[in-house]
């Protein structure tokens, strides 16, 4: 073992971490200037290994910290790494590190980076061969000089330390302390023995009276024992009887509680049924109200439809009569029109003939009148014009005017002809258009009738679907109410579960669900969602009989959360904390649970709890972790036996536990608050709620949605049909309007036709007159201008006058006749057009309208709708009647349930009264049992107070009755009163003091033996100390002589043990001969004392001659240092260490002696490591490795250097300063 490496940081001049290159296992030399830090390096090693730095005050610790430029060092450490390949240290490692760390307020040791105590370190070093009694494996600078100048007594002290006499001294001090303590105890015992002897003498005198007293007292105690024993047996019998009664009462109470719980369960079940039935009644009543409202609405619709149908039927019936009447009227109108037309046909030819004659007469009259006018004009022109030429000029002018007027007349006549022709053509065209529109009107009417029929069909279908939807709505409402009732029931069960569970746990479960919902909404951490499996309680099932024991076993572990891995739980917890959610959660990560298969006992009295649980094998680890080491046992006795035998937790079905550690827990467990039962109820309610919601969503809501879609489609169809109806009705109205307009046009054209014809006739007559005047003027042109008419012209005038008179008379007759006929025609035509034909048009229109109504579309649709509404009313009434029946039946059922509830309430009350009665009885029995137990304790106490009794006392009075016993007891008490003055405890005190005397005598003997042993031990210790000093002196003296001869060839040295005699004079013994002298002196005294030694002297000769032997004070300084070195080497050879540290031991030696010391170190380095410092080259010759210490900026540094650099360093230390 040797120092392999040293690491220093912050210690004295070593500020930065300094890792010294590994040392050689032989001789290592450190060189450096004065003050560079060599000695500090040695101090660092001594700081870790030596006792010198063991108890440091804060200011001393601060003094060891580095002080220099830069920030202050607040802590320092020194670490020594030992090569332990030889296993000298009792640690199974080739390298062992020992570090000491100090600061202003700390001082710690670390062994292989583990904190240890100072004592542990010192013990470890002592086990490796580092002796506390020989600290000279580290020789500091100046130590050689100190030893060279030390007095003899100091060397004796050194020899005693090397010999290890300190241990003997410590043990001697302990022995002296024990001896003093023993002496004190001996004195106390002597005093007690003296007092006891005096007391025993006094008690001896009181014994005689006490004997009589004891005789009667013995009898009294025997009697009292018998009395108390009889009372005790009687009390025990009563207690046994009470225990049996209590057990019976307890069993009965359990049965009553079970019956009461059954009654409560039945009552809860009945209450639930009543709630469900009331909810059902409420739903049915609500449905009935809805049905009533629907029925009222349906009745209103039916009434409207019935009135409408009646109106339509009446209208159809009326239309039929009206049609007959209209047809009859039409026929009469046609007959009258035909009659009038016939009359008109008969009158019109006459009228036309008269008119034609009249027109001819008028034309002839006009012509004759014009001709006469022309003749008169001709006669008048004779006086009018003066000449023929003037006349002709005027005639030409008149002719020109007449020609222009005639042309105008002709144009007018042509225009009227054209107008009449156009009127006739328009009439034909109008008739064609009218017929075409009439055909279109019939088509439109047919299309409207078809659309009406289709509209009513769609409407009826829509009404049927609405009725079906109303029914489904009622069903949905009923289901919703049932759903609400289920939700309320679920909330109550969840509330009960919450009440039976801690708030923090429930908050934790809610918070975990929020975290998972957050992951689902965000669509993240899918593996976390898949890796979470809920709480333990939701993942297994078992029989209800095991609920209590399972729940008691698991406790709050029922609410632990099962996850696939610790990663899943970490993710959940990170989000849990991030969202700052409340609650307490505990995870069971399946990948981290370490469960082993358990060997269960094979017995019929117990079964493994886990075998009664049903769960997914995937979660086997979690359930084995919670329930795997628990047995369900038949009874507490079995539980206790198995728990002790198999180191397993055991539990009964009632929940009484026996831990494998020995603890027993149990008592009454309220099964009504079973969390497993509550969880089962919650789960069942959730499933039922889910089924109702699924039914509601899958059936009713889907059907309602389907019907809504169909109704929407039908509404769209109805809107489309209505749009088409409006379109075709608008087209029909347009056609009718257009037909009316055409008819009016035709009538208007007929009205203007006759006036135009008369105007044409008038124009033609006027044209003839103008043409006649023109012919007359033309004939007069060129004739002679006469003042009188010619005879022929005069005759013509007379003839014309006669003709004119005749024509005027005829014309008047014709005019009268024409006016008469025209009046007839006008009256007939007016009657025809304004009355008959107009009425005929009205009749035709009414007949057309009747034909539209007579199609029966509206009536058919109304009748169909009325039948549908009647069916719905009937269905509604039937459903309402069914609801009434159901309500009656349900109310009857509620009454029956209420009666049953009353019965169960009475039964529960009876059970409760019985339980209360049993409880009171039990309390009475408990009180009585308490009193009996108290009496029992009193009897037992009194029996104990009687003290020890002879054997006869247990049997002597057993046959006596209590009366006899009390009589004898009274007699005893009377006799005992005579000895009331006697010291009752005299005998006891005598016996007690006698026993104490014996014990004290034994204790005195033991102390005497102990005192003698201590004296012997002290003599042995003194002898061993003497022998150790003698042996050590011999070894050191021998080694000193040998080492000195090697250091000083031819020289001689010896150690001298100096003694002091009784008279104060001194003697001395040298080296080897001292042993016999001491043994001789030992024969005169039983134990030789080391106190006779006063010092260790040194006698040396550097020439080897006996006569030149000198004392230390006679030597020079170098010789003293050499002798001191020889003494140190001698001590080290006597008690070798694994390594040595020498700081400038060759300082005062000359070159020759330094060489001898170097050779000595080389010899010793074969078996031990040396680390030395020097300023001389001789020590370098025996070294294996060299180190240089430099000091820069108040900081020391140590590095490996070569031998040449080391020599250069010691020869001229300024080179590497």
From Swiss-Prot:
Signal peptide: none
Binding annotation for ATP: 32-39
Effect recorded for residue 105 to R: Stabilizes interaction with PDS5A and WAPL
Cellular-component GO terms for this entry: chromatin; chromosome; chromosome, centromeric region; cohesin complex; cytosol; lateral element; meiotic cohesin complex; mitotic cohesin complex
SMC hinge domain location: 530-642
UniProt entry tagged with the keyword Cell membrane: no
InterPro entries associated with the record: P-loop_NTPase, RecF/RecN/SMC_N, SMC, SMC3_ABC_euk, SMC_hinge, SMC_hinge_sf
Modification type Phosphothreonine: residues: 783
GO molecular function: ATP binding; ATP hydrolysis activity; beta-tubulin binding; chromatin binding; cis-regulatory region sequence-specific DNA binding; double-stranded DNA binding; dynein complex binding; mediator complex binding
Modified residues (N6-acetyllysine): 105-106, 140, 1190
Post-translational modification: Ubiquitinated by the DCX(DCAF15) complex, leading to its degradation. Phosphorylated at Ser-1083 in a SPO11-dependent manner.
Localization, UniProt: Nucleus; Chromosome; Chromosome, Centromere
TM regions (residue ranges): none
Name of the molecule in the record: Structural maintenance of chromosomes protein 3
């Amino acid at each position: 073992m040797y120092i392999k490496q040293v690491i220093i940081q912050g210690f004295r001049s070593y500020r930065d971490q300094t890792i010294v290159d590994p040392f050689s296992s032989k001789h290592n030399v450190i060189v450096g200037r004065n003050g560079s830090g060599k000695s500090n390096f040695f101090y660092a090693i001594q700081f870790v290994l030596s006792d010198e730095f063991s108890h440091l005050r804060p200011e001393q610790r601060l003094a060891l910290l580095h002080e220099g430029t830069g920030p202050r060092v607040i802590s320092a450490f020194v670490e020594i790494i030992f090569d332990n390949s030889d296993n000298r240290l009792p640690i199974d490692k080739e390298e062992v590190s020992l570090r000491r760390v100090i600061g202003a307020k700390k001082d710690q040791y670390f062994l292989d980076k583990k904190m240890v105590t100072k004592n542990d370190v010192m013990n470890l070093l002592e086990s490796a061969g580092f002796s506390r009694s020989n600290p000279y494996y580290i020789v500091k600078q100046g130590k050689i000089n100190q030893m060279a100048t030390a007095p003899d007594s100091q060397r004796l002290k050194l020899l005693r330390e090397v010999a290890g006499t300190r241990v003997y001294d410590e043990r001697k001090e302990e022995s002296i302390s024990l001896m003093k303590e023993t002496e004190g105890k001996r004195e106390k015992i002597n005093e007690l023995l003296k007092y006891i002897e005096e007391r025993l003498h006094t008690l001896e005198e009181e014994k005689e009276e006490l004997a009589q007293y004891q005789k009667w007292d013995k009898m009294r105690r025997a009697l009292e024992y018998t009395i108390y024993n009889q009372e005790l047996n009687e009390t025990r019998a009563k207690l046994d009887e009470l225990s049996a009664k209590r057990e019976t009462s307890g069993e009965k109470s359990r049965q009553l509680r079970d019956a009461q719980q059954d009654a409560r369960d039945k009552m809860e079940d009945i209450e639930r049924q009543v709630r469900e039935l009331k909810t059902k009644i409420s739903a049915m009543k609500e449905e009935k109200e809805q049905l009533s409202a629907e029925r009222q609405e349906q009745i209103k619709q039916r009434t409207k439809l019935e009135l409408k149908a009646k109106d339509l039927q009446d209208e159809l019936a009326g239309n039929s009569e009206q049609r007959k009447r209209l047809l009859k009227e039409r026929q009469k109108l046609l007959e009258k029109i035909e009659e009038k037309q016939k009359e008109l046909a008969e009158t019109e030819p006459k009228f036309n003939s008269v008119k034609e004659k009249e027109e001819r007469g008028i034309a002839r009259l006009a012509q004759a009148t014009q001709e006469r006018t022309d003749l008169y004009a001709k006669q008048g022109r004779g006086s009018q014009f003066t000449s023929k030429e003037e006349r002709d000029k005027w005639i030409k002018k008149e002719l020109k005017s007449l020609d222009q007027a005639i042309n105008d007349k002709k144009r007018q006549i042509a225009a009227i002809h054209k107008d009449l022709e156009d009127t006739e053509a328009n009439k034909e065209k109008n008739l064609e258009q009218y017929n075409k529109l009439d055909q279109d009107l019939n088509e439109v009417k047919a299309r409207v009738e078809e659309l009406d029929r289709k509209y009513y069909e769609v409407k009826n279908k829509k009404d049927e679907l609405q009725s079906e939807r109303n029914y489904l709505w009622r069903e949905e409402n009923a289901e919703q109410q049932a759903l609400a009732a289920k939700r309320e029931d679920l909330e109550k069960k969840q509330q009960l579960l919450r009440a039976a569970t801690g708030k923090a746990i429930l908050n934790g479960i809610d918070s975990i669900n929020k975290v998972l919902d957050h992951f689902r909404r965000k669509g993240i951490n899918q593996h976390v969602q898949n890796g979470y499996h809920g709480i333990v309680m939701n993942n297994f099932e078992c029989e209800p009989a095991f609920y209590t024991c399972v729940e008691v076993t698991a406790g709050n572990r029922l609410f632990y959360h099962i996850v696939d891995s610790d990663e899943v739980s970490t993710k959940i917890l990170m989000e849990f904390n991030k969202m700052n959610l409340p609650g307490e959660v505990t995870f069971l990560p399946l990948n981290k649970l370490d469960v082993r298969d358990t060997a269960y006992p094979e017995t019929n009295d117990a079964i493994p709890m886990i075998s009664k649980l049903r769960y997914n094998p995937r979660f086997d680890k979690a359930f084995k972790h919670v329930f795997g080491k628990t047995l369900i046992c038949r009874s507490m006795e079995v539980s206790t036996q198995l728990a002790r035998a198999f180191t397993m937790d055991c539990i009964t079905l009632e929940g009484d536990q026996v831990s494998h550690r020995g603890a027993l827990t149990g008592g009454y467990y309220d099964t009504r608050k079973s969390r497993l039962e509550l969880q089962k109820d919650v789960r069942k309610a959730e499933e039922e709620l889910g089924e109702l919601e699924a039914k509601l969503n899958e059936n009713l809501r889907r059907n309602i949605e389907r019907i809504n879609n169909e109704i929407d489609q039908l509404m769209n169809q109805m809107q489309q049909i209505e749009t088409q109806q409006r379109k075709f009705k608008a087209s029909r109205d347009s056609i009718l309007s257009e037909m009316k307009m055409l008819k009016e046009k035709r009538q208007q054209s007929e009205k203007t036709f006759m006036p135009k014809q008369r105007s044409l006739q008038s124009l033609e007559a006027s044209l003839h007159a103008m043409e006649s005047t023109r012919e007359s003027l033309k004939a007069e042109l060129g004739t002679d201008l006469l003042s009188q008419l010619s005879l022929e012209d005069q005759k013509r005038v007379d003839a014309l006058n006669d003709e004119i008179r005749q024509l005027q008379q005829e014309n008047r007759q014709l005019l009268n006749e024409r006016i008469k006929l025209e009046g007839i025609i006008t009256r007939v035509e007016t009657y025809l057009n304004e009355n008959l034909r107009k009425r005929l048009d009205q009749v035709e229109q009414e007949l057309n309208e009747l034909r539209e109504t007579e199609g029966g579309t509206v009536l058919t649709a109304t009748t169909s709708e009325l039948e549908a509404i009647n069916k719905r009313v009937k269905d509604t009434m039937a459903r309402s009647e069914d609801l009434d029946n159901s309500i009656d039946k349900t109310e009857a059922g509620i009454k029956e349930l209420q009666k049953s509830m009353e019965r169960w309430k009475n039964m529960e009350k009876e059970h409760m009264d019985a339980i209360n009665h049993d409880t009171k009885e039990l309390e009475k029995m408990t009180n009585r049992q308490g009193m009996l137990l108290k009496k029992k304790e009193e009897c037992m106490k009194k029996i104990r107070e009687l003290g020890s009794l002879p054997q006869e006392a247990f049997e002597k009075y057993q046959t006596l009755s209590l009366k006899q016993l009390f009589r004898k007891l009274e007699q005893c008490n009377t006799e005992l009163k005579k000895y009331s003055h006697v010291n009752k405890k005299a005998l006891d005190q005598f016996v007690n003091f006698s026993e104490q005397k014996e014990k004290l005598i034994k204790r005195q003997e033991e102390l005497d033996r102990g005192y003698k042993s201590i004296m012997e031990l002290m003599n042995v210790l003194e002898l061993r100390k003497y022998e150790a000093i003698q042996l050590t002196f011999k070894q050191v003296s021998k080694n000193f002589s040998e080492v000195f001869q090697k250091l000083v060839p031819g020289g001689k040295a010896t150690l001298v043990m100096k003694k002091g005699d009784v008279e104060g004079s001194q003697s001395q013994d040298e080296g080897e001969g001292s042993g016999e002298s001491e043994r001789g002196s030992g024969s005169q005294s039983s134990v030789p004392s080391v106190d006779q030694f006063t010092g260790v002297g040194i006698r040396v000769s550097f020439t080897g001659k006996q006569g030149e032997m000198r004392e230390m004070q006679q030597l020079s300084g170098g010789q003293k240092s050499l002798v001191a070195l020889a003494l140190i080497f001698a001590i080290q050879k006597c008690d070798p260490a694994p390594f040595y540290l020498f700081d400038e031991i060759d300082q005062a030696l000359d070159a020759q002696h330094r060489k001898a010391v170097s050779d000595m170190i080389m010899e010793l380095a074969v078996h031990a490591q040396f680390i030395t410092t020097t300023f001389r080259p001789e020590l370098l010759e025996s070294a294996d490795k060299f180190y240089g210490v430099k000091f820069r900026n108040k900081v020391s540094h140590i590095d490996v250097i070569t031998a040449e650099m080391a020599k250069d360093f010691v020869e001229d230390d300024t080179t590497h300063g």
